[in-house]
Amino acid sequence: MKLDGRRTSSNVEDRRGMSGGAKAGLGIGGIIIVALMAWLSGGNPLTAVMEQVAENGGLGSLTGTNTEVTSEQREFTQEEQELAKFSTQILAGTEDVWTKIFKENGSTYQVPTMVLYTDGVQTACGQGASEMGPFYCSGDQKLYIDLSFFSSMKSQLGADGDFAYAYVIAHEVGHHVEYLTGTLQKVHQQMAKLSQAEANKLSVRLELLADFYAGVWAHHDNKMFGSLEDGDIEEAIQCAQVIGDDYLQKKARGYAVPESFNHGTSKQRMKWFKLGLQTGDIRQGKTFECSDAEL
């Protein structure tokens, strides 16, 4: 991505080097795979957690005992600082794009805050942990990211490249857009009343909508700033491919269980991201209007 000269967002809390409490153990083998699955689960990173956080948005949320936050002084490497700057530039890009889109549709975009943290963090949705991957909490309208997640994406799934990382952030912001439009709250209220299998189906549609919104952002960001370079789109498509339910489940346990899918197959994730990228039209994000076969 071409980001030279692009502004950084001021809506960032850098809590790296601060202790946010004990990390939560997810207890399902292959911690990185579980983290990636949690990242994609749209408010229900694991079945056991979903019922506790149905009213909250996010790509993972845990409840836990609040503990004192302490500061640990350390210097960050140049790579860590560059990744932090990159993340704030991407957030700034989402602010510019969604402010424009909301204004064109007669509304006002309320920007979210990005929280950078290490290991564990306190949120309005409960205790967060790096094992969960990036997540959005509707309780405080903040997205939380432990930047080490991007290294895990690269080493465990081969999802690498700056645009793949940007896709992750844009997906999180996509859940914030769902919150602002009321979609997130409505769907989670419905999910709380349904069986696990039926709730999973709604979760898939919520996740695919966030993928679509990530594509919409990329379309307009490139139109406004000429940010995309050769290979960028392929990076994001590859990322979407390796974080589908079917791919992750097969990698984690050798087989997939379609009934348990709650964030979409690789094919579905690629389809909706590409649709947003190609059209840039939020009216095309009809993940809740099409049939299961059309997803």
Region locations from a protein language model:
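Catalytic Zn2+-binding segment of zinc metalloproteases
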Residues: 173-188, 221-222
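Catalytic zinc-binding patch centered on the HExxH motif and its immediate surroundings
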Residues: 120-146
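Long amphipathic alpha-helical segments used for membrane anchoring, targeting, substrate engagement
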Residues: 1-75
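Pan-zinc metallopeptidase signature
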Residues: 241-295
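Short helix/loop segments within enzyme catalytic domains
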Residues: 81, 85-109, 198-201, 205-248
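Active-site recognition of the HExxH zinc-binding catalytic motif
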Residues: 36, 98, 145, 163-180, ...
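Short pre-active-site segment immediately N-terminal to the catalytic Zn-binding motif
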Residues: 149-168, 198-204
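Structural recognition of the beta-strand scaffold that forms the well-ordered cores
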Residues: 20, 24-26, 115, 143-146, ...
